[in-house]
A protein has these predicted regions:
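Cytochrome P450 I-helix active-site segment
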Residues: 4-62, 82-85
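Cytochrome P450 heme-binding "Cys pocket" and the immediately downstream C-terminal segment
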Residues: 5-8, 162-200
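Active-site-adjacent bridging/hinge elements
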Residues: 27-30, 139-151
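Hydrophobic, well-ordered secondary-structure elements that form the walls
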Residues: 56, 81, 130, 155, ...
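C-terminal, well-structured subdomains that either form a transmembrane helix-short loop-helix hairpin
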Residues: 75-80, 86, 148-176
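Eukaryotic short linear interaction motifs
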Residues: 83-84, 90, 95-98, 158, ...
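Conserved cytochrome P450 K-helix/beta-meander segment immediately N-terminal to the heme-binding cysteine loop
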Residues: 89-140
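C-terminal helix/juxtamembrane-tail motif
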Residues: 200-219
Length: 219
């Protein structure tokens, strides 16, 4: 958030607008300014909040690889995969954070071609950049299928805690963004170094917060 002040400011504006009564921006509101409750946060749709969360997860590549075992003999893009083979799917390389590799479409199965029509692909010009707007449709609605994202795996063996993660992120990001401004850090503290194991975690997590005191703005 601190590294992307424009996205942070837009998110705060849209959260304040969405929770206008709670934050005291409604002229006829009888209550004093306060942070929204958990129920209010979960019941209020803020497409740009969803976009920020999804883009943060995409760029964080928390789980760099997903493993699957072939239960039957099969073929992947023309390559024979015997039953019992462990297949590792990288979720932080081409198509995710790098431009997609060229693939002969005739090698894809009908199911793969159909799935490709459902999911979008990322613009190779900015696939490595933090661009929350990539998750929004032209009408401003959130599009969870805008492009590939596999931080939680996929299919019936995907992460069973996925829904809880999104709920927690929606609550925490909303409250922190409404209450505080994330200020820029010195270069020595503003790093993206990670500790790598089966998942990735930040080596350090420094923040510089400033309370938000000016709640009045024009959308």
């Amino acid at each position: 958030m601190a590294s992307h002040p424009e996205s942070q400011s837009r998110l705060r504006r849209e959260l304040q607008a969405a929770h206008a009564v709670a934050v005291g921006r409604e002229k006829d509101a009888s209550s004093t300014r306060r942070l929204p409750t958990v129920d209010e946060i979960l019941d209020t749709r803020v497409p740009f909040l969803d976009a920020i969360i999804e883009e943060t997860i995409r760029c964080s590549h928390i789980v760099p690889v997903t493993a699957r075992e072939a239960l039957v003999d099969t073929n992947i893009l023309g390559h024979h995969i015997p039953k019992g083979t462990h297949v590792y799917l990288l979720s932080n390389g081409p198509s995710f954070l790098l431009p997609a590799l060229a693939v002969d479409e005739s090698l894809r199965t009908d199911a793969a071609r159909a799935a490709r029509d459902i999911h979008g692909v990322w613009d190779p010009a900015n696939v490595a950049d933090f661009v929350p707007e990539r998750w929004l449709r032209p009408d401003g609605a959130f599009d969870p299928l805008a492009g590939p994202q596999m931080a939680f795996g996929g299919g019936p063996r995907g992460c069973f805690g996925r829904k809880m993660v999104y709920l927690e992120l929606r609550i925490v990001v909303t409250i922190l963004t409404l209450a505080f401004e994330f200020c820029d850090l010195d270069d020595a503290l503003n790093t993206f170094n990670t500790r790598e194991s089966s998942t990735e975690a930040p080596q350090d997590c420094y923040v510089k917060l400033r309370p938000v005191v000016d709640w009045d703005f024009d959308l």
